Amino acid sequence: MIMAVLMMLCPDIYASAKKAEESPAVQVLTSSKNARKLEGGMLKLARPALKKTPMAVVMDDIDMMVMYSISQKADEEEKQFAQQAINVLEKYNKVSEIDDPDYRMSIYIDNPVGENFSEIILYISRPDPSIMVFVGNFTIGSLKKVGEISDQRRMERRQAKR
């Protein structure tokens, strides 16, 4: 229901799950500069009632904090799927320190409770966890693609420094 409303309100900004790989929102995951630029135009969701259990905190070498969590309402199968997605994201993110909290963004994995376990919904939260910005819904496959793009950019930056 929430997804349907979001897609109706913002059809030009948010791609459907089928087009997640081509979505501009995917790039938000690899560049916090883009995320800051897009934040003003994204739909902010007040979700103070969300009860989530933090699973891992990882920071990449740009300046984005990534916090993964799984809904407490998720059953075992859903938790396993969400954990798979977390593992994919962790593989492509390195831990680093950021002093300025204004540049920190949390990305929540919200595995929807229901029949479809093949996609997850991502939100960016900054700085108040009760106010989230919808990014899009992705499959594990598209997250792998995002990770590979991020990994490739890291290699390019390292070579440029030499």
Predicted regions, residues:
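Glycine- and aromatic-enriched low-complexity segments, predominantly in secreted/extracellular proteins
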Residues: A15-A17, L45-L50, R154-R162
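Bacterial Sec-dependent N-terminal signal peptides
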Residues: M1-E22
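C-terminal partner/receptor-binding element of secreted or periplasmic proteins
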Residues: E22, G136-R162
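Early exported N-terminus immediately downstream of N-terminal targeting peptides
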Residues: K19-Q80
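A short, solvent-exposed beta-edge/loop patch
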Residues: Y108-L143
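A broad structural signal for short, well-ordered beta-strand segments within beta-sheet-rich domains
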Residues: M59-M64, Y92, N116-S118
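Mature extracytoplasmic domains of secretory-pathway proteins
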Residues: M64-I107
